[in-house]
């Protein structure tokens, strides 16, 4: 993944570009500034991954599912991200990306597993942060 500032200042949403060597996550100007301020904090990585990488992966996986198994390889095999994703799915999840088995996967669950389930660590960080109210239910 490469997380960058979206040069289009009129765009106020995160965008994902799969056409490059790496998956590009383009953030609006202000969001990228905030992201940049947090990315150097190791304890914030789980939050940043939950906010950016997980939804980007869900999007990418959904875009791949919309293609036939043969089209997946034809359209994406020259990108590094596709090669890495294909190998990871095969070795860690015993699933070939160009198979119909891929289509049956729960992409929200898979996206979280692909980035080591950042959600739990993100919640722990937020609950234990100095500004937290202790995590009580409303």
Enumerate the predicted regions with their spans:
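Bergerat-fold GHKL/Histidine-kinase-like ATPase
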Residues: 1-138
């Amino acid at each position: 993944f490469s997380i960058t500032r979206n040069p289009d200042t009129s765009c106020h949403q995160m965008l994902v570009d799969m056409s490059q060597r790496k998956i590009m996550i383009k953030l609006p100007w202000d969001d990228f500034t905030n992201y940049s301020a947090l990315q150097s904090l190791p304890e914030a990585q789980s939050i940043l991954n939950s906010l950016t990488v997980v939804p980007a992966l869900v999007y990418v996986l959904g875009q791949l599912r919309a293609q036939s198994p043969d089209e997946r390889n034809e359209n994406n095999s020259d990108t590094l991200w596709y090669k890495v994703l294909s190998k990871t799915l095969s070795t860690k999840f015993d699933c070939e990306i160009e198979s119909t088995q891929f289509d049956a996967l729960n992409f929200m669950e898979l996206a979280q597993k692909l980035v080591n389930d950042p959600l739990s660590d993100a919640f722990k960080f937020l609950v234990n942060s100095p500004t937290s109210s202790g995590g009580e239910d409303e």
